[in-house]
From Swiss-Prot:
The gene is plsY. This is Glycerol-3-phosphate acyltransferase. It is an enzyme of class 2 (transferase). Catalyzes the transfer of an acyl group from acyl-phosphate (acyl-PO(4)) to glycerol-3-phosphate (G3P) to form lysophosphatidic acid (LPA). This enzyme utilizes acyl-phosphate as fatty acyl donor, but not acyl-CoA or acyl-ACP. InterPro entries: G3P_acylTferase_PlsY.
Length: 210
């Protein structure tokens, strides 16, 4: 019996449910309401992520949203790292991070209409293999400084990061990142269309967002 078979026969699946529920906490929505900035779903693009929160003009709330959305992915992974069985730890960590990511994209509390997953993606990278998070940040920052498009920066970053992981980390994490990257692209389909016709907004504008 190989490692994968042992994992699927012994893993307590409630771990993935908890990971999903943690990932589904809509920090952007909660923080904007607590700060009396309105319902973020009716502002800008309607997205609950940090970039759209920035459109409220409150940088502190946007930064807090970014941090907490990252921590959703990172904390789940860190906890699994310390408490899981070494035999199937690699698979368990990757899947727990993936379910936290899915929770952010499809939160049960908001009728499965969540964010686009970029911050949580970064958090999962930080928790699983921190060099991948560094690569993500470097790529995102470089593209943003050159082009000033948050969406394009994210799309390039989630393309490069799995390639880096393929060469320097394990197979399970790489497969999980590829799946997450595909979801990020799907969630950014409208942004991609606008980028192709030159109508995508740069960060800091007041219309649509990522």
């Amino acid at each position: 019996m190989n490692e994968t078979e042992i994992f699927f026969q012994s893993t307590p699946w409630f771990i993935f449910l908890i990971s999903y529920l943690i990932g589904s906490i809509p920090f952007g929505l909660l923080f904007t309401k607590l700060a009396k900035l309105g319902d973020i779903r009716t502002i800008g693009s309607g997205n609950i992520g940090a970039t759209n929160v920035l459109r409220t003009g409150n940088k502190k709330v946007a930064a807090l949203t970014l941090l907490c959305d990252m921590l959703k992915g990172a904390i789940v992974v860190f906890v699994i790292k310390f408490f899981s069985d070494p035999l199937n730890k690699s698979i368990l960590i990757s899947l727990a991070g993936f379910f936290a990511f899915l929770g952010h994209l499809f939160p049960v509390w908001l009728k499965f209409k969540g964010g686009k997953g970029v911050a949580t993606y970064l958090g999962v990278c930080l928790g699983v293999y921190w060099p991948a998070a560094i690569i993500f940040i470097i790529v995102w920052s470089a593209i943003f400084l050159l082009m000033h498009y948050s969406s394009l920066s994210a799309l390039v970053a989630v393309t490069i990061t799995p390639i880096f992981v393929f060469y320097f980390s394990d197979t399970y994490f790489c497969c999980m990142l590829i799946a997450m990257s595909l979801f990020v692209f799907i969630k950014h389909s409208a942004n991609i269309s606008r980028l192709l016709i030159g109508e995508e907004n740069k960060i800091g504008t007041q219309n649509r967002d990522k």
